[in-house]
Amino acid sequence: MKNVNFSSLTTLICAFTASLGLPGCIPLPNYPIEPEIEFLSFNVDDSENAVLSIHFTDGDGDLGLNQSDTLAPYCSTCDHHFNLKCEYDELRNGEWTHIPLIPAQGQVPFYYRVPRVEPSGTHPALNGTIEIAMNTWYLQSDFDTLRFRITLEDRDLHISNPDTTRFIVK
């Protein structure tokens, strides 16, 4: 009969048992139910197309819209049809000036529908990066410096903190 070292076996069993509980020891993210955003980057390629990148969190996992989300409050004429809004500002004579864009007057605002994001696992919290391809990203104007003020809205109509891009020169 082989002599078993119970001290080593006990240590091994305790270490294995403790490792089973480790995933439960990792704290779950504790994000607020309102989306939170942070501007990451704004890059323009050689074709003058731009990509806006923002980081987001959402504590209850209700971010994004399906294409079929077309009834109120998400209908095409409703205020909540778009869930990512980039308000356009220009630097005019040393002061930032908001330039409102009015669709009824044929102007196209920098508004987007971010697709629905499904939480992975059992915890609903979301954390990730949104990248928006902006084929048109500036207005024809005598002023050459702009920025975007960005907000993100979830399906419960919670609006994120606003964040602002760095200044952008056309």
Residue ranges and their predicted role:
Residues 2-12:
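Bacterial N-terminal signal peptides that target proteins for export
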Residues 6-7, 18, 46, 52:
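Intrinsically disordered, low-complexity segments enriched in Ser/Pro/Gly/Ala and basic residues
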Residues 20-24:
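C-terminal motif of bacterial Sec signal peptides marking the signal peptidase cleavage site
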Residues 27-170:
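Non-catalytic macromolecular-recognition regions in eukaryotic signaling proteins
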